A protein has these predicted regions:
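Long, low-complexity, compositionally biased polyampholytic IDRs enriched for Lys/Glu and Gln/Arg
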Residues: 623-715
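Arg/Lys-rich, intrinsically disordered low-complexity tails that mediate electrostatic binding
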Residues: 712-732
């Protein structure tokens, strides 16, 4: 089989799996228009056939992993090309920074050709196949996309499918009177039907662009313009519109876009007597687009922009059997997050997240704190009513709080589309400025700055805790503040959204490696959180998630569990320190600092948070370590016991020896004493005997002396002879 035949077979296999449903829905919507359907099918094959081979290879790889965008390793960054890099080539030059930031998904805000001063930030598209010349060319985009893919990054583009610019070729030809192209829009000869529409259709921009219709002088007709007068609504009841717009979508996919953001998708079907929002036909169109994408370019994910109340958002996922959008903006959680910051009360957040956690895990949200758009206060006021909260009054409070008008607030923001008739307005501002960083730095108050940075980081930690795709608005990773220069630009000064659409500050970005700076503190903290999220399976989209009761209305608790891993995430939205009473019996490890603890009662500082982690594997390892420690302790104890026994035996031996030595010494002493006594007695006896002998000798001497004396005396007396005889006689007698 040749390459062409093989590709045709691949296309046919994908089509055959979906053909029955595709034909049924298309025919039902377009009244069995077989010609239109056949054109649609031929267009699908044409776009498949012209798809670059590297993209087809990526399709095949991701067909095996259709949920690639839901990986916990995915981190998105949304940016304006002109603000970030000046041009598409400039963005390409800064890919290393985005990679350093951890981005694996880059959303390039509207970059298609649109008329200056009438662009609605790029959403009034004049040509879906041409890049705005100031930003570069379509070839530049394709080169950027290819470079992103080489670096493991996906690319998202906006696709404004509800309308075109009045400068689009179709609109120009409609103005020229060509009915075929007028039929691609909604034209009316007078205001009768438009007025009927206005009775049920809400206004999108009641102050900056009131009404839903505009007068077209060129043809002397009324044209539907739901958003701005220069944006003409497309008529999707005309199959040519759907076919051609779908082809435009595939053109962008073939240039390298992996994710297509369907802008204003709830508005694309119109019917008199309705709100022209979220009609059943919209879901039919999105379902057809989803199947078409799976046939032509399976790598592509459809991201639905549905800025509505929660009950209107979820249906755009379709069903598990017949899915529509792959991913949806989690606009409700975004708005509820800022409500929680202002009120310091987590009860609405618990209620709202509880509804999301109850949805099928296959439903994936894009989670964000700030984006290019304003913050609309589309909260669950039915739930808030039980606390005595009035919708209009609460919106006033929120807008006052985030403009710094409320006592204790350091937030800095501006209103957008303030409608005094109904007391409604939306809010603009960067994450850093809404957290109080701008005000703290302006005041030079380090204590306030530390607290504001802590809040900023805590909100991002909350963002990363949720299942889905976390996306950071460019500049938030360095705490970039509001840009008030738009007030001086006549093309921008009537649109306060440019407050947070300022140029990326590369000067500030250079400070990201200095841990003492605001930029360095936030950048480093976010990278640490992103790395933890990407390397722990408990953050996977398939994880079980639930609200944990903290018995503290200021502290939000979220639990996650996946494949033997458990996470307890706690967030203190209060300006005071607080305690979460969660009574978790396991021993947890703090993912931020490695400390271990029993999570029964956990204290958090103001705007503090913690990620407590437990895993079966770690528990087993801990048990093994404990067993090893026990065995080691037992061995050590046995060793010490034996050593003690040896020591005792040695001591006893030493003591016995000492006793023996002492006894021997005593015996020797006693023997010596006895000997000494005997010697003394003998000496005494000898002395006595000597004395006796001496006495005897003395007596004898004295006797001799006496005799001699007597003899001498006798001689002297003349009787010597007689005396001698007498003495001799006496001596013999004796």
């Amino acid at each position: 089989m040749g390459k062409t035949e093989g590709q045709a077979e691949e296309f046919r296999a994908r089509l055959d799996k979906r053909l029955d449903e595709l034909k049924w829905l298309y025919s039902e919507l377009y009244h069995n228009d077989e010609n239109a359907f056949q054109y649609f099918l031929s267009m699908l094959y044409r776009m498949y056939e012209t798809r670059p081979e590297p993209m087809k290879q990526l399709d095949r790889e991701r067909e095996a992993n259709p949920d690639w965008c839901k990986s916990n390793e995915v981190l998105g960054v949304m940016l304006y090309t002109n603000c970030f890099g000046g041009t598409l080539r400039g963005v390409r030059e800064h890919l290393s920074y985005l990679k350093e930031s951890g981005a694996t998904y880059i959303h390039l805000m509207p970059l298609l050709a649109s008329p200056k001063g009438r662009s609605d930030g790029g959403y009034a598209v004049a040509d879906f196949r041409t890049v705005e010349p100031e930003l570069g060319t379509m070839e530049d985009f394709a080169a950027l996309a290819a470079e992103c893919h080489k670096n493991g990054m996906s690319v998202c583009l906006d696709f404004a499918l509800n309308h075109t610019s009045e400068d689009h070729e179709w609109a120009r030809r409609a103005k020229a009177g060509e009915k075929e192209f007028q039929d691609r829009y909604f034209f009316f000869d007078n205001w009768n039907i438009p007025n009927d529409f206005d009775r049920t259709v809400p206004q999108v921009f009641p102050t900056t662009a009131p009404g839903n219709f505009s007068w077209c002088d060129a043809v002397q007709k009324v044209v539907m313009t739901t958003f701005y007068p220069y944006q003409w609504d497309l008529n999707y009841a005309n199959p040519t519109v759907f076919n051609d717009m779908t082809e435009n979508l595939f053109f962008l996919c073939n240039q390298g876009a992996d994710i297509i953001r369907l802008d204003a998708v709830p508005y694309i079907w119109k019917a008199l007597g309705t709100t022209c929002r979220n009609l059943p036909q919209v879901h039919t169109l999105v379902r057809i687009m989803r199947m078409a994408v799976e046939i032509v370019c399976p790598v592509t994910q459809l991201l639905g922009e549905v800025v509505m109340e929660p009950s209107k958002v979820v249906p755009y996922f379709g069903t598990l059997e017949k899915p529509e959008c792959n991913v949806l903006y989690n606009v409700t959680t975004m708005a509820t997050t800022w409500h929680t910051v202002a009120t310091r009360d987590v009860r609405l957040m618990k209620h709202q997240l509880g509804q999301i956690f109850a949805l099928p895990k296959q439903y994936s949200f894009l989670n964000y704190l700030r984006c290019h758009d304003d913050i609309g206060w589309g909260l669950d006021y039915g739930f808030l009513k039980q606390f005595g909260i009035d919708e209009v009054g609460h919106k006033h409070f929120l807008n006052d709080f985030f403009r710094g008008y409320f006592y204790g607030s350091d937030a800095r923001g501006e209103l957008y589309n303030d409608d005094p008739r109904i007391g409604d307005a939306r809010l603009c501002g960067t994450t850093a400025s809404l957290c109080g960083i701008e005000a703290a730095e302006y005041e030079g108050n380090q204590w306030k700055l530390d607290r504001a940075i802590r809040l900023d980081i805590m909100l991002h930690a909350f963002l990363f805790t949720l299942s889905g795709v976390p996306v950071i608005y460019s500049g938030d990773e360095i705490g970039q503040r509001n840009d008030y220069s738009y007030h001086e630009d006549p093309y921008k000064w009537d649109d306060s959204r440019y407050l947070h659409r300022g140029n990326f500050s590369w000067e500030d970005a250079e400070k990201r490696k200095d841990p003492t700076t605001r930029e360095g503190r936030i950048f480093t903290a976010l990278r640490e959180l992103e790395t933890i999220r990407a390397t722990h399976e408990v953050f996977r989209a398939e994880a079980d998630t639930w609200i944990m009761e903290t018995y503290n209305d200021h502290i939000l608790g979220i639990g996650r569990y996946y494949n033997g891993e458990k996470l307890v995430a706690l967030f203190n939205f209060d300006v005071q320190d607080g305690t979460a009473w969660i009574n978790e019996p396991e021993e947890y490890r703090n993912l931020l600092n490695g400390d271990r603890c029993r999570a029964t009662a956990y204290g958090l500082p103001a705007f503090g948070f913690v990620w407590l982690y437990w895993s079966k594997e770690e528990e087993i390892e801990a048990a093994k370590q404990a067993e090893s420690a026990r065995e080691a302790a037992e061995k050590q104890a046995e060793k010490e016991r034996k050593a003690a026994a040896r020591k005792k035996a040695a001591e006893e031996k030493k003591a016995a020896k000492q006793v023996a030595e002492e006894a021997a010494a005593k015996a020797a002493t006693e023997e010596a004493a006895a000997k000494a006594e005997a010697e003394e007695a003998a000496a005494k006896q000898a002395a006595e005997e000597a004395a006796a002998r001496a006495a005897a000798e003395e007596a004898a001497r004295k006797t001799v002396e006496a005799i001699m004396k007597t003899e001498r005396a006798a001689k002297k007396s003349g009787t010597g002879a007689k005396t001698k005889r007498t003495a001799k006689k006496k001596g013999s007698k004796k």
